[in-house]
């Protein structure tokens, strides 16, 4: 299977299935000397793990990470970092019926069409459990970015038709849906409760903001920073769309209302007076906050009756059994953070060779 690796220098390769023995990742290109512990990784995995509230799957997993290689005495060595999380609570018997039919909204049919085979137990590689590997790798990227003063923060912007109307960063950790607006979180909880009672599910939007990203990161044409962010986010299961900055609303704007005016401060620093572009111009960061949004579809595994076909080509009705999230948005917040961080870490390392001055700073002989 191709397509399990991501990145150029800061590069990860993920492996494992939802109902296999475990999920893991190998991360190449991490600079030597970065302080790193399993606790650093675990902090982010704990934000993603299931079974923490009534709006997540009841699957109980500790999601405890083990670092197998690439560190010594608490620091990265510059060699590949291998990590694993063992599966503990897979109920494969819940999926025995699925072997005979294709679930609407899932990758069952397309995997069969491509490979002539599929792991029907929880979706195999297309399961949301695959994101464990992304989060583990992203935690390293976030640690590296923090060394540069760069922060990446994501939160739930909307669930269904309920969108935040205010922003309080403290509130994000105070509700199960990771919304920075307490009133919106309460309304979204009511919407989800209603959907669950109707054996249904809901989608939503995660917004991610990057602070203190320097100008000049990213490459034009095929390696644009926004293009790579879009690819990274759309690669997350259930993401169906991405916006950068003002996104699709610029389509009804004018040039004058959409353009971000530049200004020179008294200290000589260059800033923009607005940020409709979302911190990226021409595929390169402009020094403003980078703002991206990922739109998630409703969870396709719903308990209500649905029409589909079996592998014999017969039309049938099904009611999906098993333990499923009524919404993936809240748990996906940390996944969006981590995928964003992976793109930025890679772009920063790639960009070090863009100027001769950068190369000289590292490799030029001391003339003294």
What is each of the regions a protein language model found here?
Residues 11-14, 119-130, 215-219, 275-280, ...:
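A short glycine/serine-rich beta->alpha loop
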Residues 113-221:
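Glycine-rich, mobile lid/loop segments that gate access to catalytic sites or pores
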Residues 301-368:
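Internal helix-turn-beta structural module
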Residues 99-124, 306-324:
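Short acidic, glycine/tyrosine-flanked loop/strand segments centered on an H-E-D-like triad
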Residues 15, 21, 199-202, 206-315:
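Glycine-rich anion/phosphate-binding loop at the beta-strand->alpha-helix junction
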Residues 1-59:
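N-terminal, positively charged regions that mediate nucleic acid binding
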Residues 44-104, 108:
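Glycine-rich, N-terminal phosphate-binding loop and its surrounding beta-alpha-beta segment
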Residues 21-33, 129-150, 223, 227-231, ...:
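Alpha-helical support elements that line or immediately flank enzyme active sites
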